[in-house]
Amino acid sequence: MNTAIITGASAGIGTSAASLFSQRNFKVINLSRRPCKVEGVLNLCGDLASEENLENILPRLNEAISQSDSVSLVHNAAKMRKDSVLDCSESELREMLEINVVAISALNRRLLPQMPRGSSVIYIGSTLSMKAVPNSFSYILSKHAQVGIMRATCQDLMGKGIHTALINPGFTDTEMLQKHLNNDTELIKSLAKMNSFERLADPSEIAECVLWAHHNPVINGTIIEANLGQKES
């Protein structure tokens, strides 16, 4: 049996990944506040930033891992907000880092020692993992941090038979993007034109990248840009 443990599988890329892994006969476990609606997914709902929650669900995760030939741990859950280096408060920054950085490390520390050879750790980054735009300070900071986490994961797991990669989606048609842009149809259309195909990526396309990355350890330690060929200014 193969298992996919996906954070934030309740919407967007996470839901698409849950659906695809399920179709490929993986046991799929969703870790998020809200349940994933894909049939057959085991939902362990709670706050990823809560150490108490992680300790409560750990026995069930370890049980699933112990029964698996391989595990794909997909760090997809993320928080996004509008702020800048001029106005982001310390409490707001800590809140962002708890989900986008600390929760990742907390899960890795608990699960990686149990995962068998042939497993993978896949991080869902962002175009903003590698560049910056105005008014997304804390999100950009956290996504840059994920690059470092992935690269450190690669080095720390040398010889363990577990590979890692970071996938950077471009603008993708998700609930989080719609909310971040206040459902501004014209703005969304303008963003869609910022790549060579002049459309938003579909979450299912990113999910295909995740599954492919799990099955191909040759990409260990790499960053995969999944942005339809972004136009550079």
Segments predicted by a language model, with ranges:
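Active-site helix of classical SDR
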Residues: 108, 142-143, 150
